[in-house]
């Protein structure tokens, strides 16, 4: 489900990847959380890649629309 949502936001013509950010668990960062713009990620198998950073799907905390603050995904 999460992978499908990310693919939809990246590739569906009705969405602009620049409008979304992914918040993920990163131990040692402030509040153990970092954010990455959706437009900067690449999906491969069960990981997201951002520069040299590998982000497993289970570490994704939220996907947020920057324009209106809507949370499209929130980890339970």
Curated annotation (Swiss-Prot):
InterPro entries: MJ1316 (IPR040459), UPF0248 (IPR007547). HAMAP family: UPF0248. Belongs to the UPF0248 family. This is UPF0248 protein MmarC6_0667. It comes from Methanococcus maripaludis (strain C6 / ATCC BAA-1332).
